Design a protein with these regions (language model features):
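Short glycine-rich phosphate-binding loop at a beta-alpha junction
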Residues: 54-66, 97, 245-254, 327
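Flexible beta->alpha loop and helix N-cap segments adjacent to enzyme active/binding sites
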Residues: 7-36, 67, 71-74, 78-80, ...
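Extreme N-terminal starter segment of soluble prokaryotic enzymes
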Residues: 1-4
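Active-site cores of enzymes that catalyze phosphoryl transfer or operate on phosphate-rich substrates
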Residues: 179, 185-227
Length: 476
């Protein structure tokens, strides 16, 4: 029975298609429209989903009526959205709809893709219908919400407001703010930033804060923001551990993408699972899981539109040896914000000029860090990882030999590591293994195959355009 899950109407729209326990397709609307963080569906993604058959039911990722009430309470006016009418009017799809709560969808997306029989689930985001953080106890088909933080208090809104305050785009550039932290002094504005968290409703931002300070050190604002976030994150972890008796933690919501903070969770839980699309886009999958309350067969994040033939290992190696930088667009696209080998820009991490060259190609700020992808069995030799494996770039780790790999080490000496095994991605693993035999280097720089402000490559035309515009060979 074909069922769809949909997340749309706020930001990062997506569709997931399942048949029983099998995940057949999951992708982001932005990959088809070309509009970064696209909030709405489009004909292209609908048609891609329809290739797997007409849906018998659609699961929606939140409860629109509750969202309408929250908007009224927040003074944002009356605006009610009817998902079923929208799908019928725009796409001629008229099937039964079933709704799940916003945080319920987050929690279910995490738990029902994990390998845990039972777990504590911690969800942290900007805002659901009313919840902004929640703690759940999940076991089998049972999900029980034990506690929640309510709007307007919100760690996600706090982080987004501070992102806006330093001149970046909220709900999009939070990862840039995280990269700025290494260049700032967390104590310089700590008292003021903590005061904003404790005393202000930050839903409409905080641009007036220190508005007369013409010499505002935005890097130190970022550092103070991260410090406050980590302090409050740890409080939530402690509360979650106290309220449950599980050693397993599922971490979900957009804040689970804060890889600089995620290591804190290892102090309180033995095993941690973060579904690689923990934000709202992942809730298209979560809505299905929340309503059906059964495990989905998670085989990895490669669930999107497929392109190319055999993974072009030899071509990639030749170009890496020749120019040091190459693109790959092959197989099903990653479901989530990280490129994990199928829509990647790969580079030799040893070159002193590689980081600047890749930043120039991607039109990014020069202070931005890049991630390494490394064979899992070599990871502990080169990085102090807080977990055994990090297949989805969800944790930072200190590099033991930063001078050897300048392209993938941030200013604070850390790297956002992706480990890979043959079972997880045999082609990427074989590429790394051959690269290692050729060079003695077991890793590559791995970043997404896109430029700032644009989605990842999603078609042969996208790949050709990238190659022609930016002078980088892209192989499919």
């Amino acid at each position: 029975m074909i069922e769809w899950g949909i997340s749309a109407g706020a930001h990062d729209a997506s569709i997931t298609v399942v048949d029983g326990e099998e995940i057949l397709f999951a992708s982001h609307s932005e990959r088809f429209s070309g509009q970064k963080n696209d909030a709405w569906l489009n004909n292209q993604i609908i048609n891609e989903a329809l290739k797997f058959g007409q849906p018998t039911k659609i699961h929606w990722y939140e409860r629109p009526a509750f969202r309408t009430v929250r908007r009224l309470w927040a003074g944002q006016g009356f605006q009610h959205f009817f998902p079923s009418k929208h799908m019928k009017k725009c796409y001629n799809i008229d099937v039964p709809f079933e709704y799940a709560g916003h945080h319920e969808s987050h929690a279910a997306a995490g738990f029902y893709t994990s390998n845990f029989d039972e777990a504590t689930v911690l969800v942290i985001d900007a805002i659901g219908e009313l919840d902004t953080a929640s703690i759940w106890k999940c076991s089998g088909s049972k999900m029980k919400k034990l506690w929640s933080m309510k709007y307007p208090q919100s760690l996600g809104l706090f982080y987004s407001a501070m992102t806006d305050r330093v001149g970046l785009k909220p709900n999009e550039d939070e990862y840039i703010l995280m990269g700025m932290v290494a260049y700032g002094d967390p104590e310089k504005y700590y008292t003021g930033v903590r005061g904003l968290w404790e005393h202000e409703n930050l839903h409409r931002g905080c641009r007036s804060w220190r508005h007369t300070d013409n010499d505002l050190d935005i890097y130190s604002v970022a550092a103070a923001t991260q410090k406050v976030y980590e302090e409050e994150f740890e409080k939530l972890l402690i509360l979650a551990a106290e309220m449950t008796d599980s050693n397993n933690l599922v971490l979900m919501g957009g804040c689970a993408l804060n890889c600089s903070a995620n290591h804190i969770a290892t102090k309180y839980f033995n095993d941690i699972w973060i579904m690689p699309n923990p934000g709202d886009a992942g809730s298209s999958l979560g809505a299905i899981a929340a309503n059906n309350r059964k495990k989905l067969k998670w085989t990895g994040p490669y669930l999107g539109k497929s392109m190319g033939g055999k993974y072009p290992i030899e071509k990639l190696l030749t170009e890496l040896h020749s120019s040091g930088i190459v693109g790959v667009a092959n197989g099903p696209a990653e479901f989530g914000p990280r490129a994990l080998g199928n829509r990647s820009l790969l580079a030799d991490p040893r070159g002193n000029d590689i980081k600047d060259r890749v930043n120039e190609i991607k039109k990014r700020q020069k202070f931005r860090p890049f991630a390494p992808v490394i064979m899992a069995e070599h990871a502990s030799k080169y990085f102090d990882l807080p977990v055994e494996e990090s297949p989805y770039m969800q944790f930072t780790a200190r590099c033991k030999y930063p001078d050897l790999f300048p392209a993938i080490v941030h200013a604070d000496g850390t790297s956002r590591v992706q480990t890979v095994t043959w079972e997880q991605h045999p082609e990427l693993y074989n590429l790394l293994h051959t690269w290692y035999l050729d060079t003695g280097c077991p890793m590559l720089l791995n970043t997404s195959l896109n430029v700032k402000g644009k989605p990842m490559v999603n078609s042969e035309k996208d790949a050709d355009d990238f190659e022609q515009m930016y002078g980088v060979k892209v192989f499919s």
